[in-house]
Amino acid sequence: MEGSNQFLGTERIGKLMQKYAIPCIISLLVGALYNIVDQIFIANASYLGSYGNAANTVVFPLTVVALAIAVMIGDGCCAFVSISLGQDEVRKAKRSVGNAVVVCLVSSIVLTAIYLIFADIILAMFGGTVNAETYRHSQEYFFYITLGVPFYMFGQAMNPIIRADGSPRFAMISTLAGAVLNVILDPVFIFGFRWGMMGAAVATVTGQVVTAILAVWYLLHMKIIKPAAGDFALRGKVCSRMLTLGITSFLSQISLVAAMAAINNMIRKYGALDAVFGQEQYAQIPMAVVGIVMKFFQIVISIVVGMAAGCIPIVGFNMGARKSARVKELFTRLLAAEAGVGAVALVLVEIFPRQLIALFGAANESVYYTDFAVRSFRIYLCMIILACVNKACFIFLQAMGKAGESTALSMVREVVFGVGFALLLPHFFGLDGVLYSMPLSDIPTFLMAAYLIVKTYRSLEESHT
């Protein structure tokens, strides 16, 4: 076997986590910043404000659909490659990379076509009709964001594959380059040219194009798993195994889309019944605020997922090499780190909610906006420690090849409990019921995750003895 990946089975676990997890965290944080930076600049543009923020909230789940497909391909290929290399099957690893590229390109083109053809229907499904001004901004933003979907998906899919090739730093740099360009262009297009939602979208897409170009360059210069021309021919067994390994990443994202769709529509419905938010000039506030809360949640989850996803090559290699003691040590360290991230986030939202809100243009908004935002932060994120631990379990189980358990946990959290509570609780508690839906869903999910954690620990101990 090519020796450059052998250190995954011998190097100290803590050092490996730093090498692989930190670049992955930065990459995911930077990826999350694409949409978050847009929302910050939009919110602080007085001619867009909460209407633009609400539009961003409407479109955001649709970018997550693209991300879901991309990470299914990328994370699945990453796990496939890592396990193959651990078993000294380099040829199989190269074949999976070629197949991943083709599947990503085809699926991105299909998704772009669907978005362009059914734009009005899709926006209405995600709450875009809260009022006329929000809908107008949503249409404009969505059109230009859709044009960048193929570039976005390719860049996101290649990121974990580049890490699996032993280049986590390049994966980080490629994502960082696009995000930095987005940050530079956003104020130019929004405040300088006054392009509004179009400007925010064009800045984002430009950054995505840069990331995709860097990913193409790396694909042509891979160190270990560079595919040959014949490896791009689709093979059913390779695609099936790869997508099976990545299905948890897909479902964890796509189920989040289902939850966001339910939340957006319940906000639109019960906001219209509220004494304040039922007025046309304030109707967009709940949608805008919940979008801000979700963006903060996304930042935290990006750190959590980055830690876990960065460990996929380490887990895959050591599972393939039958070094279960190292896998167990990694699992223990990962859970402790994830809980720590959740604790820090909880302190921030409970003590400094107004400072967090201020980033998103609160100075330009009414007192109704600020008060609802403070309440939303404290309610929606009150169980964020459990959410962090749950996410870690989903991805770790996936890395160990236990796609069934991981998929079940992910679906139960977002769809069964998340959507269920989002549809049920507002009947009794109005808008507050919508906010409580996600934290409440983390409690039963954690109990299920705890059972699987204990079961996994025992299986690792048995395989080691």
How should each PLM-predicted stretch be described?
Residues 19-38, 144, 178, 207-211, ...:
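Transmembrane helical elements of multi-pass membrane transporters/channels
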Residues 50-61, 138, 142, 201, ...:
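Small-residue hotspots at the loop-to-helix junctions and early N-terminal turns
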Residues 9-48, 61-76, 80, 105-112, ...:
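N-terminal transmembrane alpha-helices
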